[in-house]
Amino acid sequence: MTSFLSFSAISAHPPTFSGASFRPRSFSPRLFKSCVKCTYAEAGLSSASWSAPIDIVADVKSERVVVLGGNGFVGSAICKAAISNGIEVVSVSRSGRPNFEDSWLDQVTWVTGDVFYLNWDEVLLGATAVVSTIGGFGNEEQMKRINGEANVTAVNAAKDFGVPKFVLITVHDYNLPPFILSNGYFTGKRNAEAELLSKYPTSGVVLRPGFIYGKRKVNGIEVPLDLVGEPLDKIYDSAERFIRPLRSLPASDLILAPPVNVDDLALAVINAVKDDDFFGIFTIEQIKEAAAKMRA
């Protein structure tokens, strides 16, 4: 499941799109101009006897990503990966900067705010992509609001402002009984997906991980989820051909859906931000493929 940012004060139908798609998009990236001065000397003449400066102006792509829920388990991994890849990062969350220390934290702009009451004009200025990790649990209405309405609000704000790409982290398409899939957690996330893919049909990205593992910090204390997730991941990889047929059994995904390393999920997000042809819905396997592409 996605890491969840606590939106406690935050008082449809599933999308018809199936699978990832690839097609060039028409949006213009954020650019800045780089000027290089060169000298040129004619044949037979020394550079001292005749030379003239030539100004070369080149357009260079520069990414600026706004991460909603950037101080959470998944969000902080995304921020860290973005910084490592030379991407400017703005994090938006209700509690601001995380309460642990790391060298990359000072390179992120930490904004404290509620997605429903943000000054989007300030937050989205210059953004080339928005990444949302917003999600959480609670009662039925809270889950619809946190997982659905909060993300729908963010999608519409980004679209209205003209941000060219939006990446949404939701949840694996579990083969659970309908009465479970109809609760606010799942319906909220699917409603958010539908809104994203309708507003960003050729540049919206939906990543659907299952259990996410890694070293999670809770109130400054490290919780090593990788002690469980990493061995499971290796077992599932080695036994994939035996496990795959069993995944058609009702509710089998709860046990048999492969876990995802939080760093792999973060790299898949970076791939989505950098690759203009990367859009659509991405499964657990496709998330891992995108991460491998970034590591290659």
From Swiss-Prot:
Keyword Ribonucleoprotein: no
Transit peptide extent on chain: 1-57
Pfam families: NAD_binding_10 (PF13460)
InterPro entries: ComplexI_NDUFA9_subunit, NAD(P)-bd_dom, NAD(P)-bd_dom_sf
Entry keyword annotation includes Nucleotide-binding: no
SUPFAM superfamilies per the UniProt record, alphabetical: NAD(P)-binding Rossmann-fold domains
Chain segments annotated as coiled-coil in the UniProt record: none
Primary location class: plastid
Signal peptide, first to last residue: none
Subcellular localization(s) per the UniProt record: Plastid, Chloroplast, Plastoglobule
PANTHER family: NADH-UBIQUINONE OXIDOREDUCTASE 39 KDA SUBUNIT-RELATED, OS04G0403500 PROTEIN
Similarity comment: family membership: Belongs to the NAD(P)-dependent epimerase/dehydratase family.
Protein name: Uncharacterized protein At1g32220, chloroplastic
